[in-house]
Amino acid sequence: MSASIISFISAKGGTGKTTTALNLAVAFAEKGLKTLLFDLDPMGSIGFSLARNDREWEGFVEHILKKVPLEEVIIQTKLDNLYILSRGRMAPVDVCSYERLLFSSKVLSNTLYQLINDYDMILLDTPSGLGMVTTAALDTSGFAVVALQAEPLSLRSVSQTLALLERVQKTKNPNLKLLGLLPTMVDGGNPASKSIYHTIVQSFEGVFEAYTPRSALFLDASEKGVPVSFLGGPRTPEMKRFSMLASEIEARLEELKGTTGVQNEYSQRSLI
C-alpha cells in the first residue's frame, strides 16, 4: 500500500474546499479505501466542520511540537476506513510560527513519510489562499485538486493558482500533478453562476464532470456537524455527487499513476 497524497487548494475563501475534502474522504472510505483526512489549515476547518471545539482534539501540532506519536493523535472515526488527523491545539498568536515551520522545514514531509504506507488515500485540506502552508502541502503531494467557486473572483484567480503549481513543479516537486479543476457551489438557478461554470469548462482542461452544486443540504450538514451523506433520509443528488467525484478521481489516478452495490437510503449517523 502506498497512498495517493492529494492537496485540496483554492486561491480564495468560501469555495467549499473543506466541504469537498471532508465529503470526498467519506466517499473514498465507503468505497473501501483506507483514507486519512489531514487538516493543515491553521483555522482547523475540519474540526469546525464536524461541530467540535477546536481545542478538543490533539493533532498535528502536538505531533510536531511535543513529539506525540501519530498513532495517539490520529482519530479513528465511526466509519470504517476513515481516519482524521486534526490540526491540533494552537493559539491564534502561534499561527505565523506554524506557517513558517511548515514552509521552512521538513516536518510535513517527514510526517507523510510515516503515513504513506498505511493508507490508500491521504487528503490534505489546506487553508484558503496560496501562502506558505499551501505551498508546503504542494511540495509534498503527488496530486492537487483546485476548487473553483462558480463566481467571477474565483475565475480570475485560476492563473495565479496554476502559476503556483507550475513553480512548485519546477523548483521543489517535479512529480506533482494537477488532478483537476473542481467547479464548486454551482447555482443552476443563477444565470451568472451557470455562465461562469460553462466558461470554466470551455476554458480549461481537466475540469471534473462531477461539480458540486450550491445547496441548502450542505448548510444543514454543516449545522449538524456531519458529512452530507450522514444526514439520513433518501439518498439525494448531493450525496451521490461525491461518490461520482471519487470515482472520477480514482479513474484519473489510475491514468496518471497506473495504479489503483449503492444504498438508496440511510439512517442519520454521527461521524465522531
Show where each model-derived region lies.
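P-loop NTP-binding core
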Residues: 1-272
